[in-house]
Every structure is written in structure tokens, then in C-alpha cells.
């Protein structure tokens, strides 16, 4: 088996290029695995011996051959600005849940919510420029014909150029009735100005994520959201014409 640790856009291409060369040379499968084990982010289980503690937790992982990295490291995309992004998607014939253009604004998160694995393992935070996002979204809208653009990241409202980006998207696509959606917003930095802007096209749903029903539990999971934040955000939403909002909660904390 081949396991990729971390973000895959760069390392996957490196593996495929190595595979093409291996196919030309027609060496053994073991030779191929040995060759790609030196690629940062690649972990080959067969090239390591794993020792467990008595309680079945991992005690140590050591290479069983020479010239194998002693410890595989996860791969991080340092330059998200120029990393390949899907620009020609397969559009299904049937209605699907995420039938929209999905625009990744940045990677990582600085919030540190204790329940969020992604917020911990995808650090550091790396933003894409507005110009790069304009280029991506223009190609995606033309190639798919979708009538909605979803601004997606671990915490979309933390994107430093969100106001500038939404200004562009509304100005550029409102005439074609292409709407903008902001999924899973934080209550403590919800901007009614941006919400008002995107509803000029159509009033998409609003989703907030308080995660827990009491302040004590929100503090325990380090959510950083107060009861007042929830009341203020929902009050503003209703005053602006929304008649419902979606709230995400975790059950069983």
C-alpha cells in the first residue's frame, strides 16, 4: 500500500510521474515502493516495522530497510496560490447535494477548537489572493453552468479579503442570477454587510455553528462563541428578512 500524509495535490503528481518511469523500466513492485518512499509525504507501511505497547498503542515505527526516511512527514502545500485547482468538473445528470461551484478561499485555521481535527492538522493558515480566486471562479462558472458559488474553507468568514471578493462576485454574476453562499459561519464575526450584499441575487440559507447548547460546553471545546453572539447574529438575520437559520450542534458531548 501507499499512504499519503497531508495535502495531496503535489505529492500525487510526483507519485504518478514516478509510476510512469517505473512502468518504462519494468522493475519489481518492491523497487517502485522503495523509490517513492523518499518523496516527502509518502508512507509505505511494508517498509516499516511497528511495535505496540501493551495497551495496543503504537510504541515505535522504524524502517526495515536502509535509506528509508526514519520518520515520514506530512506534506504541506506552501504555495496555495499556484497549486492546481479543478477547473473542468464533471456535471452530473441528476440533482446532487453539492451542485454548485465550490471555491476554496484558504487552508488552515487559527481558531483552535478542540473537537476539530482539520483545524489542527492543516495549519498554518494560507490564503489565496482575490485575483487568483477570480480566475478560478470565472473558469468554473463557464465550464459547469452552475447557478451558485459556495465560498468554502474551515472558517470562511475569517478570510481577510472576504468583502472585496463578495463585491466582485455579486457585481460580476448577479445579472446571470448566480447566487453566493457562505456555509457554516462563525457567530462572533458574522458580517451583516456581506450577508446583505449576497442576498441581492437570492436569499440563500444561513448556517451558524454554535456546536454546543450551553456556554460551559462551548468553553470546554474552546469554541469561543457566547450566547450573546448567537442572539445578535440571529436577530440581525431575521431583521434582514431571513425567516430561518440552520444551527449545527454536536450531540453527546
Predicted feature residues:
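Conserved structural-core and active-site-/substrate-pathway-adjacent residues in large, well-folded domains
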Residues: 1, 42, 83, 108-109, ...
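Glycine-rich beta-alpha loop elements in corrinoid/cobalamin-binding modules
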Residues: 1-63
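Structured alpha-helical segments in the cores of large, soluble enzyme domains
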Residues: 12, 101-109, 133-141, 230-240
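N-terminal [4Fe-4S]-dependent radical SAM core
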Residues: 45, 51-102
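N-terminal pre-triad scaffold of radical SAM enzymes
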Residues: 89-115, 141, 183
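Gly-rich Lys/Arg/Thr-decorated short loops/hinges at beta-loop-alpha junctions or inter-strand turns
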Residues: 92-93, 113-121, 212-218
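Iron-sulfur (Fe-S) cluster-binding segments and ferredoxin-like electron-carrier domains
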Residues: 116-132
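Conserved SAM/AdoMet-binding glycine-rich loop
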Residues: 139-253
Amino acid at each position: 500500500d501507499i499512504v499519503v500524509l497531508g495535502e495531496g495535490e503535489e505529492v500525487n503528481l510526483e507519485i504518478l510521474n514516478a509510476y510512469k518511469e517505473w512502468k518504462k523500466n519494468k522493475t519489481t513492485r518492491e523497487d517502485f515502493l522503495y523509490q517513492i518512499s523518499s518523496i516527502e509525504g509518502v508512507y509505505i507501511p511494508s517498509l516499516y516495522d511497528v511495535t505496540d505497547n501493551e495497551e495496543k498503542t503504537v510504541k515505535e515505527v522504524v524502517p526495515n530497510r536502509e535509506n528509508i526516511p526514519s520518520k515520514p512527514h506530512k506534506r504541506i502545500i506552501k504555495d496555495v496560490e499556484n497549486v492546481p485547482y479543478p477547473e473542468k468538473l464533471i456535471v452530473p445528470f441528476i440533482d446532487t447535494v453539492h451542485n454548485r461551484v465550490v471555491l476554496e478561499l484558504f487552508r488552515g485555521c487559527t481558531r483552535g477548537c478542540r473537537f476539530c481535527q482539520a483545524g489542527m492538522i492543516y495549519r498554518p493558515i494560507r490564503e489565496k489572493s482575490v485575483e487568483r480566486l477570480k480566475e478560478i471562479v470565472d473558469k468554473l462558472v463557464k465550464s459547469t453552468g452552475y447557478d451558485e458559488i459556495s465560498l468554502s474553507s474551515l472558517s470562511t468568514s475569517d478570510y481577510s479579503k472576504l468583502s472585496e471578493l463578495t463585491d466582485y462576485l455579486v457585481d460580476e454574476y448577479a445579472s446571470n442570477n448566480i447566487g453566493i453562499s457562505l456555509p457554516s459561519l462563525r457567530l462572533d464575526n458574522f458580517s451583516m454587510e456581506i450577508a446583505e450584499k449576497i442576498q441581492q441575487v437570492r436569499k440563500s440559507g444561513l448556517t451558524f455553528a454554535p456546536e454546543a447548547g450551553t456556554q460551559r460546553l462551548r468553553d470546554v471545546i474552546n469554541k469561543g462563541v457566547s450566547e450573546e453572539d448567537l442572539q445578535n447574529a440571529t436577530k440581525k438575520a431575521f431583521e434582514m428578512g431571513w425567516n430561518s437559520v440552520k444551527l449545527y450542534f454536536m450531540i453527546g458531548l
